[in-house]
């Protein structure tokens, strides 16, 4: 096909097609303009919904709120769980707890060294199967507002339990409403009298949890239980610097 003079002109009479760099645009900028236009359309659709939603308040996860999380791992232990039953995790009776087959105590020292304000206390439970290729889920039941003189059973039957959260980790908030935890030096109390630390220091201001765990398996399973307490400490800046130097 040779040169055709008529190709220089458009199909419209009296006009010509002029192509120069002033009328060219990169494809990326075109796509960017399309995306921005879609975002503006989407924002215009959500504006009345957002105005209505601003009139309501929703609760957030208090574990992810302000403050610093300090963990104290009490023990790791292997338990044998029978089918259709649930075992008590911890009876809070001092350093023995409920030792069965193998127990390892982790924290010998209390992690909070100074007088700090305790905002929240969490009971964290991590469960792991001890044998590979086991297809079952972990179940759990717990009670908070039990009578102080109530003696919990070591084994109960499963009745309407719920499944443990993602990654086989479950956290329970132990904070009592209307109770403020005093500023005390917890490290000395923890190190001097571990057995009386829970009864004298924690349980007057926080709930004493009775936690039972089980499995959906039809066989006897060995599970690893790791029990921790998470203290949420209020972080605040001192009025005057206590130290001077580049490290502070």
From Swiss-Prot:
The keyword GTP-binding does not apply. The keyword tRNA processing does not apply. GO terms for molecular function: structural molecule activity. It holds the Pfam family Polyhedrin. GO terms for cellular component: viral occlusion body. Keywords: Viral occlusion body. Component of the virus occlusion bodies, which are large proteinaceous structures, that protect the virus from the outside environment for extended periods until they are ingested by insect larvae. Belongs to the polyhedrin family. This is Granulin.
């Amino acid at each position: 096909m040779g040169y055709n003079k008529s190709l220089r002109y458009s199909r419209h009479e009296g006009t010509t097609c002029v192509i120069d760099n002033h009328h060219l645009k990169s494809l990326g900028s075109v796509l960017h303009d399309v995306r921005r236009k879609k975002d503006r359309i989407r924002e215009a659709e959500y504006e009345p919904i957002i105005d209505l939603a601003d009139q309501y308040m929703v609760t957030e996860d208090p574990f992810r709120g302000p403050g610093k999380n300090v963990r104290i791992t009490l023990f790791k232990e292997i338990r044998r769980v029978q089918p259709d039953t649930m075992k008590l995790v911890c009876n809070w009776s001092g350093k023995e707890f409920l030792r069965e087959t193998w127990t390892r105590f982790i924290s010998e020292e209390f992690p909070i060294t100074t007088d700090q304000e305790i905002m929240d206390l969490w009971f964290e439970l991590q469960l792991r199967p001890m044998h590979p290729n086991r297809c079952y889920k972990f179940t759990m039941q717990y009670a908070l507002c039990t009578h102080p003189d109530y003696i919990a059973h070591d084994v109960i039957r499963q009745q309407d339990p719920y499944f443990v959260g993602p990654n086989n980790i479950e956290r329970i908030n132990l904070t009592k409403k209307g109770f403020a935890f005093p500023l005390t030096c917890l490290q000395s109390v923890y190190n001097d009298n571990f057995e009386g630390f829970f009864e004298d220091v924690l349980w007057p201001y926080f709930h004493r949890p009775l936690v039972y765990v089980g499995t959906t398996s039809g066989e006897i399973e060995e599970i690893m239980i790791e029990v921790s307490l998470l203290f949420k400490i209020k972080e605040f800046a001192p009025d005057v610097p206590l130290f001077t130097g580049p490290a502070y």
